[in-house]
């Protein structure tokens, strides 16, 4: 499983890429691999105010449907409609296929997430 350096990871297998006071959120390689071929993605509304732990969206595969949770508080600034049009993008490039761009409300929440090294150890225990 690919784990990229420089991202933050949640125990629910979401990744967060921080750029200033904004963050891109998506699902990890482990998550997409576990789901199998992704056939449908539901994203949040632009402008939605989300709290950490809220459902960010839904990813459906031929095997299962899975909620995706936001690991941080934030306002949805943008969604990636390309993955709605072609959900297989997430299978092919999970770290390039973000789901939502949010305005971070509290950067200290990032301290609750895992680094790449911590996430690799977490995956070894899964």
Curated annotation (Swiss-Prot):
Cofactor: (R)-lipoate
Entries under Pfam families matching the protein: GCV_H (PF01597)
CDD domains: GCS_H
Cofactor binding note from Swiss-Prot or TrEMBL: Binds 1 lipoyl cofactor covalently.
Modified residues (N6-lipoyllysine): 63
SUPFAM superfamilies associated with the record: Single hybrid motif
Protein known as: Glycine cleavage system H protein
Organism encoding this protein: Thermoanaerobacter sp. (strain X514)
Gene that encodes it: gcvH
């Amino acid at each position: 499983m690919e784990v990229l350096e420089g991202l933050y990871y949640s125990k629910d297998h979401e990744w967060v890429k921080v750029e200033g006071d904004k963050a891109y959120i998506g699902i990890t390689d482990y998550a997409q691999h576990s789901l199998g071929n992704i056939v449908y993605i539901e994203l949040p509304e632009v402008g939605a105010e989300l709290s950490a732990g809220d459902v960010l969206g839904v990813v459906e595969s031929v095997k299962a449907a899975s909620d995706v949770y936001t690991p941080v508080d934030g306002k949805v600034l943008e969604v990636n409609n390309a993955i709605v049009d072609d959900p297989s993008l997430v299978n092919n490039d999970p770290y390039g296929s973000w789901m939502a761009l949010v305005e971070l409300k509290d950067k200290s929440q990032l301290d609750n997430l895992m680094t790449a090294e911590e996430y690799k150890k977490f995956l070894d225990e899964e």
